Amino acid sequence: MASGVQVADEVCRIFYDMKVRKCSTPEEIKKRKKAVIFCLSADKKCIIVEEGKEILVGDVGVTITDPFKHFVGMLPEKDCRYALYDASFETKESRKEELMFFLWAPELAPLKSKMIYASSKDAIKKKFQGIKHECQANGPEDLNRACIAEKLGGSLIVAFEGCPV
């Protein structure tokens, strides 16, 4: 079911910047986005970047100690959102970083909001080619480290964002 909602160019640019890791200077790496939250525009016709709802790589360990906990705290309690999160995790063999796409549709969100976000998900996913991991979360219990580790690879994952799972 398509909703006719468009995806803003800035959303696509941010996805590309997060997906493509160029050889960068330490200053450029600090400005790279760790997480970004997207919402619908006021007229509900376009998916846009939510103002002020991002975590930069340079903030991790400086102003933000636990980036995933901070990310979860940025999600609204009573409305839906889309998000990209650059997950850092360890398997038994190696350390990895992979993008995760989230549809946040909490129980307390209005039914109309849940319907439009669910029906617009394909529009944003088509723009996000190459995403390996997708997660729909309906409450904070869906966003604990064990649930996320399961999405990333189950029993192969030994740590997520530096914390054992």
From Swiss-Prot:
<comment type="function">
    <text>Actin-depolymerizing protein. Severs actin filaments (F-actin) and binds to actin monomers (G-actin). Acts in a pH-independent manner.</text>
</comment>
<dbReference type="GO" id="GO:0030836">
    <property type="term" value="P:positive regulation of actin filament depolymerization"/>
</dbReference>
<dbReference type="InterPro" id="IPR029006">
    <property type="entry name" value="ADF-H/Gelsolin-like_dom_sf"/>
</dbReference>
<keyword id="KW-0009">Actin-binding</keyword>
<dbReference type="GO" id="GO:0005737">
    <property type="term" value="C:cytoplasm"/>
</dbReference>
<feature type="modified residue" description="N6-acetyllysine">
    <location>
        <position position="19"/>
    </location>
</feature>
<protein>
    <recommendedName>
        <fullName>Destrin</fullName>
    </recommendedName>
</protein>
<dbReference type="GO" id="GO:0051015">
    <property type="term" value="F:actin filament binding"/>
</dbReference>
<dbReference type="InterPro" id="IPR017904">
    <property type="entry name" value="ADF/Cofilin"/>
</dbReference>
<feature type="modified residue" description="Phosphoserine">
    <location>
        <position position="3"/>
    </location>
</feature>
<dbReference type="Pfam" id="PF00241">
    <property type="entry name" value="Cofilin_ADF"/>
</dbReference>
<comment type="similarity">
    <text>Belongs to the actin-binding proteins ADF family.</text>
</comment>
<dbReference type="InterPro" id="IPR002108">
    <property type="entry name" value="ADF-H"/>
</dbReference>
<keyword id="KW-0597">Phosphoprotein</keyword>
<feature type="short sequence motif" description="Nuclear localization signal">
    <location>
        <begin position="30"/>
        <end position="34"/>
    </location>
</feature>
<dbReference type="GO" id="GO:0051014">
    <property type="term" value="P:actin filament severing"/>
</dbReference>
<feature type="domain" description="ADF-H">
    <location>
        <begin position="4"/>
        <end position="153"/>
    </location>
</feature>
<keyword id="KW-0007">Acetylation</keyword>
<keyword id="KW-0832">Ubl conjugation</keyword>
<feature type="modified residue" description="N-acetylalanine">
    <location>
        <position position="2"/>
    </location>
</feature>
<dbReference type="GO" id="GO:0030043">
    <property type="term" value="P:actin filament fragmentation"/>
</dbReference>
<dbReference type="GO" id="GO:0015629">
    <property type="term" value="C:actin cytoskeleton"/>
</dbReference>
<dbReference type="GO" id="GO:0030864">
    <property type="term" value="C:cortical actin cytoskeleton"/>
</dbReference>
